[in-house]
Amino acid sequence: MVRKVAVIMGSDSDWPVVKGACAQLKALDIPFEAHILSAHRTPAGAAEFAKSARANGFGVILCAAGMAAHLAGAFAANTTLPVIGIPKIGRAHV
């Protein structure tokens, strides 16, 4: 069975960070789903998604959110699947 990739954003403003990854997954015909889940605004929803990800057919979780790595950490704390944090470069990074 081919497992899906979960592409998780902390908010819709993180879309520019993940749209290239989604385009590449689509081009390679790799099944994926993109979701907006916040470690701060919707922590219970994020935790539940992570806990049930394997049972829902996911094999890896990509997380991109703001200037901090909290989202990837919140997901990694709630799943045994690989979680990859995608950094968002901002004004604070020089």
Regions found by a protein language model. Give the residues of each.
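Residue-level detector of functional hotspots within protein domains
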Residues: 1, 46, 69
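Glycine-rich phosphate/diphosphate-binding loop of Rossmann-like nucleotide-binding domains
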Residues: 3-41
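N-terminal beta-loop-helix "entrance" segment that forms/cooperates
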Residues: 32-56
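Glycine-rich phosphate-binding loop
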Residues: 49-87
